């Protein structure tokens, strides 16, 4: 072995099966994680080849565990042996990434307009949805209704959550410090389920907390 550093070592080994190179510098190296192996096979026909989500951002450099880089503690998904894939930890941003299109600025502007008019992202595709409904059998119509209901309910929860975490007018708490960690975790998990149900992706990783944390 190479001494202490079990938390970082375990996290980086979890999906790669590789012993990471012990460093807190830039020369990090672990292995390709199994989710990315699957993503290359299963992700060609979906909007997202894979999703990497979590509830804590974590640093990508520096000494986080007895000489091991923070990149080892904060990531379980590795695209190459030297390239960890950072997690999306903000449920609102993940929702918009899944269900909106356009540049980041266009997505943010669309969010502001929808919230101002109290509209859902599904309102933007209502006509297409009605056309699709007519083409489906009763069972498929029921499934589609169930999916749309899930999206609407989750959107409402996200709006409520974003209002609750405001500390000052126009200022939100940092996304790595949610007001209610349990609800934050449930929102991310539900978004992952919707992504699977909508066949937006077939591969996802969910890292609830960074290695060595007491979550």
Where are the regions a protein language model picked out?
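Ligand-binding pockets and gating/stacking loops
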Residues: 1-215
């Amino acid at each position: 072995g190479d001494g202490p550093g079990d938390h970082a070592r375990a996290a980086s080994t979890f999906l790669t099966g590789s012993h990471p190179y012990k460093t807190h510098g830039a020369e990090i190296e672990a292995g390709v994680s199994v989710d990315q192996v699957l993503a290359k096979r299963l992700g060609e026909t979906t909007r997202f080849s894979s999703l990497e989500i979590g509830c804590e951002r974590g640093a990508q450099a520096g000494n986080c565990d007895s000489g091991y880089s923070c990149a080892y503690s904060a990531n379980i998904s590795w695209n190459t042996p030297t390239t960890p894939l950072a997690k999306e930890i903000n449920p609102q941003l993940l929702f918009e990434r899944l269900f909106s299109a356009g540049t980041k600025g266009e997505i943010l502007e669309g969010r502001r307009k929808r919230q101002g008019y109290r509209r859902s992202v599904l309102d933007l595709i209502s006509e297409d949805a009605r056309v699709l409904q007519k083409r489906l059998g009763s069972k498929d119509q029921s499934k589609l209704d169930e999916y749309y209901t899930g999206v609407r309910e989750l959107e409402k929860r996200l709006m409520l959550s974003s209002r609750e975490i405001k500390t000052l007018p126009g200022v939100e708490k940092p996304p790595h410090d949610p007001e209610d960690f349990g609800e934050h975790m449930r929102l991310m998990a539900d978004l992952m389920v919707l992504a699977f149900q909508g066949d937006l992706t077939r591969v996802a990783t969910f890292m609830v907390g960074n290695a060595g944390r007491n979550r």
